[in-house]
Amino acid sequence: MIGSFALAAGGTGGHLFPAEALASELLGGGSRVHLLSDARAEAFAGRVGEIETHHVRAAQLGGGAAHTAHALGELALGTLQARRLLRRLSPACVIGFGGYASIPTMLAAVSLGLPTAIHEQNAVLGRANRLLAPRVRRIATGFPATAGLRPADGARTMQTGNPVRPAVLALARTKYKAPQRGSSIELLILGGSQGARIMSEAVPPALATLPTRLREMLRVSHQARPEDLPGAEAIYRKNRIQAELQSFFTDVPERLARAHLAICRAGASTVAELAVIGRPAVLIPYPYATDNHQAANARAFADAGAGWVIAQPELRPDTFALYLENLLGDPAALTAAAQRAGDFGRPDAARDLAQLAIELGLGSRAQGRAA
């Protein structure tokens, strides 16, 4: 057992959830875990009671000269604050998960000579990790290839995959049974944790124009924004499509395991969960994501044979209906994609990332004894 670890993450779910998964793995091994983030992580503090959460000052760069000057000042103060914290906590190593709130802690760890690593969830290196990559000892990636890494980073880089929550791991590689003639077809429609307007504007009308025999087979789970629920529900009801709509499903892993096909965004966590459970998907990347990273995530998934990609500007009800009719009528293609999705999954990501952290910590101990 190694005494303690520090995790630095931006204050949004995309950065915090992988950190939580690693924390759970390390806590299970008897270590203490400290999370260093900004005030946005307050809601996260209660998710795993054993994680000690510390707020570090940070601000996002960008905007005008005045904002940039303020942000640089906050980052400098946050780095000094993180240095004091890390000296007191004395972690075996420090792992960063991206997001601007991770920068002060990671710079502080580097300046103190602590063992460091970063984990990049997306198929494109994020801006914070792009700054930190040349400075840390190891780089872990969620995808087989990550744009933005330098050739010189290769020897320090390993693919661990993206850690997923325990509820997803419990359903890893659930057997896929393609829809058969006359049986129901389970569709799961997700637009990220807050839903997405395009999913409600384009997908229900597309399903409504499917042939009657196909519409009658559909069993739809649709996560939509609260303001979009009435309109989508009216379309489903008018066209006699069995659909359950909610603004947030608490049982997404179970619904995903039941699904014959998912229609969703291409965030790193979504793609990881699709792959670990092994479900085919039509991915519609959010076109305004930083560095267009969702498009890169979706392309990696599709290139593995696990699904299909439709750019948001090309998502029109009439053409999408024909697309779905052909796809849902091809059980062999769905089964093959489900198999390849499972092959693409990395259910041991949290364990492999924990092993990397432990090796870094043990290496530091060995160097300390030698000195």
Sequence positions of predicted segments:
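C-terminal alpha-helical cap of glycosyltransferases
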Residues: 2, 346-371
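Glycosyltransferase specificity loop/lid
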Residues: 3-73
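Donor-nucleotide binding loops and adjacent catalytic segments primarily
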Residues: 23, 27-28, 34-36, 40-51, ...
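Active-site-proximal region of nucleotide-activated glycan assembly enzymes
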Residues: 32, 40, 110-173
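An aromatic- and histidine-rich active-site surface loop
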Residues: 40-44, 93-112
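An amphipathic, basic-hydrophobic alpha-helix
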Residues: 64-93
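Acidic donor-binding loop of glycosyltransferase active sites
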Residues: 91-93, 257-272, 279-280
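A short, well-ordered alpha-helix in the C-terminal region of glycosyltransferases
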Residues: 333-347
